Each structure stands twice: as structure tokens, then as C-alpha cells.
């Protein structure tokens, strides 16, 4: 047994030694997760005692470079709290720029009635877009049926399941046109560079969500020719690069 403050200090030191950049913040998140409380609640009683067992296991997993999101099973994106899975790319903060770009493209949010998300993963882009374009219906497509299932579960959790559908398909091959907004974060890492990525990415994100082929542009060559048939007149496509 030890106090929360001692456990937190040990966790932060262990993660820092393992090369985790935000060691104290992540140690705090793991301790809160182990206790079933919020990180903010930790400060209310820092000297409360706890058994280290579960927390030690979580810290060692993170020190082994397993992503924090996989350990706690969740990741925030835009205004949403989403479930994550090894079958889908962990949502990145930088992908929120696609939602920002969509809002700039359509200052009148009633203009967007249909949204397509190609390579939906957790559904983060589509679900975030639906929270902003309140009258829209969305379709999310992913090659991995497991990822499509995660996205559908996130839609239910967010109360958006009545406004979207998720399907497992090879990009847009089974999709007919008629979309005002097309979003996509396709794989764009050149094949030869994947091994040099952070272990959290190279070893834990699905390879299909990373591998952009020899030059990183394979998916774009597949997708771009389909855009004219997918977009409504005045429609906009926004891709992460």
C-alpha cells in the first residue's frame, strides 16, 4: 500500500525513464483510470492509500510503448469521447483541422445535408462533422469490418446512430454519389518509413491505416478520380495530407 501521491511519482518516473514525453500527465491519467475516478479527483485526496497492483501493470504497459488510448480504451476528438480499438487508427488532434476546414468551407451549416467519410476508422471525422452540421446524414466506409463496428458503436454512444451508417467496403467502390462533403484521412506514410515511426504508431496502429505505398500516395490515386461522381454540385472534398 502507498499513497496516491507516491504512486503518481513512481509512475511518472517510470514513464519518463521509458522516454514518454508527457510522463506525469499520462501517469495521472493511468492512476485515475485504475481508481475509476477523473484525473481532477486525484488532487482532492492525494494521501489516500491504494494497492499498486493494477496501476503498476498499466504503467508497465505504457512504458512498453503501448498507446495510452489502447490501455484506457478511449480517446477524445473534437468535442467527443470515443472508444478506440487496435483495429482502427487512434484519432489524432491534427485531424481536427479537417473539421475546421469543413466549417470554413460551409459557413452556412444548413448547406451540408450529406457527408461521406472514406477510411472512417473510429468514425471520429464523420461523427465530429455531424455534431457541427446538425441537419446532415453521414456514411462512413472502412475496409476493416472491425473498424466499421467500432465506429457504429461510437455513433450509438454519441447519440448520432440515427443520422449515419457505417459499411465495410474498399474505399468508394460500393458508394453512389450525392454528397455535399467528403472527408478522408487515408494512409499516407511511405512504406519504407513506417518502421521508423514511434513504437506506439508503428507497432500498434493497423498497418493498412498507415501504409501509403512506395511514395505515400497510393490511396490518393485511388480516391481522387472518384470525387467528381461522389460530390454534389458545390460539394467539397477535404483530405488529410
Identify what each model region corresponds to.
Residues 102, 129, 201, 223-227:
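Class I S-adenosylmethionine-dependent transferase superfamily signal
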Residues 214-241:
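Conserved Class I SAM-dependent methyltransferase catalytic core
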Residues 31-104:
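Conserved AdoMet
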Residues 1-50, 54-55:
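A short N-terminal interaction module
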Amino acid at each position: 500500500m502507498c499513497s496516491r501521491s507516491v504512486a503518481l511519482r513512481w509512475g511518472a518516473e517510470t514513464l519518463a525513464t521509458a522516454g514518454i514525453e508527457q510522463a506525469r500527465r499520462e501517469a495521472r491519467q493511468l492512476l485515475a483510470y485504475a481508481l475509476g475516478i477523473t484525473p481532477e479527483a486525484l488532487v482532492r485526496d492525494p494521501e489516500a492509500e491504494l494497492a499498486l497492483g493494477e496501476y503498476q501493470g498499466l504503467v508497465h504497459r505504457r512504458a512498453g510503448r503501448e498507446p495510452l488510448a489502447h490501455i484506457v480504451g478511449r480517446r477524445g476528438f473534437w468535442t467527443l469521447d470515443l472508444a478506440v480499438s487496435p483495429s482502427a487508427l487512434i484519432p489524432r488532434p491534427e485531424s481536427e483541422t479537417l473539421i475546421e476546414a469543413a466549417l470554413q468551407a460551409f459557413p452556412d451549416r444548413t448547406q451540408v445535408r450529406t457527408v461521406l467519410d472514406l477510411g472512417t476508422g473510429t468514425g471520429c471525422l464523420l461523427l465530429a462533422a455531424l455534431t457541427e452540421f446538425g441537419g446532415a446524414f453521414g456514411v462512413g466506409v472502412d475496409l476493416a469490418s472491425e473498424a466499421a463496428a467500432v465506429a457504429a458503436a461510437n455513433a450509438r454512444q454519441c447519440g448520432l446512430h440515427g443520422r449515419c451508417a457505417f459499411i465495410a467496403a474498399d474505399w468508394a467502390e460500393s458508394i453512389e454519389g450525392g454528397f455535399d462533403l467528403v472527408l478522408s484521412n487515408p494512409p499516407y506514410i511511405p512504406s519504407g518509413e513506417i518502421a521508423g515511426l514511434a513504437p506506439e504508431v508503428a507497432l500498434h496502429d493497423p498497418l493498412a491505416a498507415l501504409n501509403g505505398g512506395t511514395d505515400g500516395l497510393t490511396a490518393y490515386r485511388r480516391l481522387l478520380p472518384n470525387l467528381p461522381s461522389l460530390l454534389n454540385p458545390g460539394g467539397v472534398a477535404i483530405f488529410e495530407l
